[in-house]
Amino acid sequence: GVGRSSLFGVWSVCFHTAKDRLAMAQYGKSEYWEERYTRDPEPFDWYQRWAGLKETFTEFAQPSHAILMLGCGNSRLSEEMYEEGYHSITNIDLCMTVIKAMQEKYRDKPGLTYKQMDGRSMELPDANFNVVIDKACLDSILCGEGSTHNAQKLLTEVARVLQPNGVYIAVSHGQPSYRLTYLQRPEFGWNVKTYTVQKPMMGMTASLSADDKDSVHYIYVCVKGEVAKDS
């Protein structure tokens, strides 16, 4: 209906029942996203806009860098970064519906490219990107069936496409006790630092969180090839 919260960019999912957990599991399914983007093509952003991420991102991502945006959806993040001089951003999403829409929307912005692709098996060369950005992609995979296996596949691919000393930046609602298990696996060789950013006011962004009590989102910055000496 007209009054649904999506019109205001708010997708707040807080569930505590078996039924709610079942609904949350849809986030791991490509059919869910195809249907959703067809039904509701208005842009929305999970968790944060560029304004909330800029301070941390600009420490690690330079305008000259080749950047990969995982699970881009119809987020405005790449557009907002483009306006600030980031002109080499490859955006991928499993959903062909949203990729076609974004290709059309940004056809006049060279360097802002959109490709239909599965992050768990990317058709991209090794060591191709300086920075990989993930805003809720890992989180949505962790909602679905086979979450641990699929998360491992995604992160293995991220490690593959990153250049030496490249940086994977994951914006998440998941606390370090739940996320570092995945990110600090020795085979990735990542030095992981955790940052926090205050959650924006309701209505500005969307939440994918199962338990949204925290007042912050977490930004996990994973630097390839810089393993801590004591790890």
What are these regions (language model features)?
Residues 11-51:
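N-terminal, positively charged/glycine-rich alpha-helical extensions of SAM-dependent methyltransferases
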Residues 45-65, 76, 80:
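Conserved alpha-helix/loop element of class I SAM-dependent methyltransferases that forms part
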Residues 66-122:
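Class I SAM-dependent methyltransferase SAM/SAH-binding core
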Residues 120-132:
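A short acidic, Gly/Pro-enriched loop at the edge of an enzyme's catalytic core
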Residues 130-148:
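A short SAM/SAH-binding and catalytic strip from SAM-dependent methyltransferases
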Residues 148-164:
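A short glycine-rich, Lys/Arg-flanked "PGG" loop and its adjoining helix->strand segment in the class I
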Residues 164-172:
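Conserved beta-strand signature within the Rossmann-like core of class I S-adenosyl-L-methionine
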Residues 177-231:
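Class I S-adenosyl-L-methionine
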